[in-house]
C-alpha cells in the first residue's frame, strides 16, 4: 500500500480497467460446448420410436400404444377402413371378380362400385335359416349383396357386422381368396351362390326399412319360430325375357347341365344344355338371346379360376364346365 493509505499503483490500474475481455480461446471453448449439447439433443430425439401412419381421406387410422419398458414404447397404427375395403376389392378382382355396369344395378347408386365374383356349385349342407324350397332336380340360385360400409359390412338387408370381429374377418378373408364363405354355403342345398360387392366406405351403415312382400309359387322352410323376411326373387320371365328368342335343342336321352353366363353389361343368362353341346353353341346362344353382341368381339372365360375357353369345338363335358358360371368379356 502507498504512503497515506491509498491503493498501490498496480492495483489501481487493474480496478480501473474493469473485466477482462474474452480471448479467442474462450470463444472456441464456448462454441464447442454448444455444439456438443446440440448433438446430444438430436441423438436423443432420433432414438425415440416412430409410428408408421396409414393415411386415408375417409377414416383416420386408430392408434394403440404398447410398452414393455418404463422409458420406451411402440405406437401401433391400425389400417384404416379405406385400406381394408380397397384391399378386399383388389384381391377379389385378382380372383376373377368383374365390374358390373352401374346402369344395370337396381339400386341406382352412382357412387357405388359393384363387383361380382360369379357363381359357384356348392354341396349339400344343413341350413338353419329360412330358405326357398324348389321343385325336384332344380338348382337353387341365391343372389347375395355384400355392402362394405365405413364401420363394417352387411349382407343384403341384414345387420351391421364390424370389421374387427374374428368371425367377420374370417368371412372377408374367404372373399379375398375368391371363395364362397362357409356360412353362405349353408344357405343352399346343391345350388349356386352369386356374391356381389358394393363399396359404401364413404358412408356409415344405413339400416334398411323392412318391406313386406307376399310370397308366391314356392314354399318356405322355416328354421326358427320367427321366420325371416325374405324378398321374392324375380320370375325367370321377368329376368330373362330375351331367352325366349333363343332356341337350344335338348336331347332328353343325353345328360343335361345348367350353364349361367354373366354378360359384359352385368346381366346374366341361364340355360340348360346337353353335355354334348359345344362351347360354340353357348356363343350362338348368347348372340341369339342378345343380338346387340352379334357385332362385338368377345371371349368366354371360366369364373374361378379365370381361364379363357379358346377351343370352342370342345364339348361342355370335355371343357369341364358342367354346372358352372361363364363370364363374357369384350375384347
UniProtKB/Swiss-Prot annotation:
Residues bearing PTM N-acetylalanine: 2
Sequence ranges assigned to domain SEP in this UniProt record: 141-206
Location relative to the cell: Nucleus; Cytoplasm, Cytosol; Endoplasmic reticulum; Golgi apparatus
UniProt-listed CDD domains: UBX_UBXN2B
Xref: PROSITE patterns: SEP, UBX
InterPro entries: NSFL1C_SEP_dom_sf, SEP_domain, Ubiquitin-like_domsf, UBX_dom
Pfam family, one: UBX
Classification via Gene3D superfamilies: Phosphatidylinositol 3-kinase Catalytic Subunit, Chain A, domain 1, SEP domain
Phosphothreonine, modified sites: 59
Highest taxon of source: Eukaryota
GO cellular component: cytosol; endoplasmic reticulum; Golgi apparatus; nucleus; spindle pole centrosome
Residues with the Phosphoserine modification: 56, 66, 231, 234-235
All residue ranges annotated as the UBX domain in the record: 252-329
MF (Gene Ontology): ubiquitin binding
Disulphide linkage map: none
Subunit structure, as described in the record: Interacts with VCP. Does not bind ubiquitin.
PANTHER family the UniProt entry points to: UBX DOMAIN CONTAINING PROTEIN (PTHR23333), UBX DOMAIN-CONTAINING PROTEIN 2B (PTHR23333:SF14)
Known function: Adapter protein required for Golgi and endoplasmic reticulum biogenesis. Involved in Golgi and endoplasmic reticulum maintenance during interphase and in their reassembly at the end of mitosis. The complex formed with VCP has membrane fusion activity; membrane fusion activity requires USO1-GOLGA2 tethering and BET1L. VCPIP1 is also required, but not its deubiquitinating activity. Together with NSFL1C/p47, regulates the centrosomal levels of kinase AURKA/Aurora A during mitotic progression by promoting AURKA removal from centrosomes in prophase.
Name of the protein: UBX domain-containing protein 2B
Encoding gene (name): UBXN2B
